[in-house]
Structures are given as C-alpha cells and as structure tokens.
C-alpha cells in the first residue's frame, strides 16, 4: 500500500477522549432505545462516513442514481451544507447552490428527472418527500447521514478513503474521526474509495484484514474515473469539451478547488502536465469578490495562449452563481467530472446488492424484473 497521509495531533488526545465519551454516550442511547430511530415504509440508502473530509460521497451517490433511476422513482435528501435557506427545500429549475447547497445542486443539474431536497431535519425531510405524488418516491438516498441516527436506514453504505482508512485514524480533534471506528458496525456495505486503478491484489488482502469487518458486511473497493473537461460557461467557450489527453505538457493550468482533499485531482492532472498552479480553498467555500479577484490575478500571470482554469464540478456550481465573476475568465473555465468504478470485477455483485435491497423493500411490489445488470 501507499503510505497514508494521516496526521495525528497527540497533544489533543485529552480533548478527543472527552469528545469520544460524548459520542459514545449518544450512540448507546440510540442502541438502548432511549433515543428513537424512526423507520419509514420506503427503501432508504444512507451514504456516509465516520471521518470528516472527502471520501467521495457525492460521486458514489451519483453512481447509485445512475443505477436506480431508470427503474425506480429516486429522491436524494441532503442537509444542504452552507446553503442560504432553512428548513425543507425541494429543488426546482430555479434552484442554485445558494438555495440548496453545492452538492445537491450538482446532483440536480446532472439528473433533472429525480427529486432532490434538503432539510436539516432528515425525518421531516423524508416525511415531506413521501407526500409527493405523480409519481410517488420509491427509494430515498440519504447523503452524508451516517451519524444521523434519528433515521433508521435500511441499507447503510460506509465510505473510507484508501489514503486515510478509518482504522488508522483517531477521534477529533486529534484526528478526523467523527465517532469511534466501531461505528463501522452499523454498515452493511463498506467501500474503500479513491483506490489507485492499478491497486495490487496484496493490498486488497491487507486492507481487508485491517478493516476487520463482520460476516454480515460486504467490502468493495472503488476508484475514480475522470471524464472530459467540460466548459462551465458553454455559451462563452470556443471548445465545449476537451479530453485530458489533449492537454499539452507546456500548457499551464490554474486549478481551483474548494473541496476537502484535492490530492486525487492533482495526481490526475499531473499525468498530463506539470504546470499546475493550485488555488485551494476550504471545503464548500463560498467565493468572495476578493477570491474572484485573486483568481483573475493568478490566471493573468500564466502565459497567454497556453492556459486554462480547471475546477471540480462541485466548485463550478458555486462559481456559476457569481455575477461578479470576470467575463474574460469564463471562456477558460472547465470542470473535471468524475465517475465511480467498482474494482475487483465486483461491479455486478455490488449493483445486484443495491437493486435487490430496493426490490425487496419497495412499496410497489409489482415492479418488473430487471433484464440487465447496470453497466457504467
């Protein structure tokens, strides 16, 4: 395995012990029934993690949408982190990253035929979704809700970063775990994300032993597959799409990220060019006028004729909202989309696991059998 990037602040262990005691007590109250988890008469799939930072929740949620939405009426419910609204909001054609959050808006932009909603109170959000008719919701995907135990999901999918496995981490603030690694026991599926596409068989075995899962838990490994660069402002761009392979080694890229961990996208771009100027912001960062001015200044320092601005799909949703963004920059801004690939020839098994759960628990038991396994 590659050396992990985990940094533990040992001097913060006392604070972590206090934090851990509080989290453990909360989990025990749910286990003992003192705090109630609510079940719903609809298949609910929770996608989450037990660590702060990016593990690829949104790309994996999009994978599930692609897998299910041709057959079932899919809804996605998120908290809508850093949105400018409160309460339950159902996405519409007028929604943007400000009203529903960047990740829900990204999902709605790519899948206009599903319902996307946000609500801080997940139980209330589910209840509102279940009142929708024509057609009724048949499966709900809960984004980043592994610690939201007031909802009892029928299928819990836990993600852990290949470069930062939860078994190597410790509780906040010394580490990045939201709860003890024992929280993994609530998951029926564990996915090791962001794996190298050429991961060695011995690494599968090492990670499997280190995660130490129970027999009822299924373990999968996934990797990111990058698509073509797509113009964020297509009306301004002379080229709508560019293959990564078309990048020239001398081409200069200003990479703008507001995500938890930009390492993966940096590694991908470095395959094609070494001339990368990184402008990194915090996760879900709301770009200010000062930030936009900094982007313009940094881009202006790159050689004319051989320069490009690359950002993530999530960051693109927030850039689009800004009327203050310099018009001269728009033709040069491209988003780099990512898709999830299940490794080890386990894609069909994973797909059938998900589809089987939804079929067995849907309120509409008369759905026809799926003829072909999903291929992505």
Curated annotation (Swiss-Prot):
EC number: 2.7.1.130
Keywords annotated in UniProt: ATP-binding, Kinase, Lipid A biosynthesis, Lipid biosynthesis, Lipid metabolism, Nucleotide-binding, Transferase
Catalytic activity field: a lipid A disaccharide + ATP = a lipid IVA + ADP + H(+)
Keyword Transcription in record: no
SUPFAM superfamilies: P-loop containing nucleoside triphosphate hydrolases (SSF52540)
Tree of life domain: Bacteria
Pathway membership, UniProt: Glycolipid biosynthesis; lipid IV(A) biosynthesis; lipid IV(A) from (3R)-3-hydroxytetradecanoyl-[acyl-carrier-protein] and UDP-N-acetyl-alpha-D-glucosamine: step 6/6
Pfam families the UniProt entry points to: LpxK (PF02606)
Any single GO CC term annotated in Swiss-Prot or TrEMBL for this entry: plasma membrane
Enzyme class: transferase
Residues annotated as binding ATP: 51-58
Molecular function GO labels: ATP binding; tetraacyldisaccharide 4'-kinase activity
InterPro entries from the UniProt entry: LpxK, P-loop_NTPase
UniProt record, GO biological process: lipid A biosynthetic process; lipopolysaccharide core region biosynthetic process
Function as written in the Swiss-Prot or TrEMBL entry: Transfers the gamma-phosphate of ATP to the 4'-position of a tetraacyldisaccharide 1-phosphate intermediate (termed DS-1-P) to form tetraacyldisaccharide 1,4'-bis-phosphate (lipid IVA).
Protein family according to the UniProt entry: Belongs to the LpxK family.
Protein name: Tetraacyldisaccharide 4'-kinase
Protein species of origin: Bacteroides fragilis (strain YCH46)
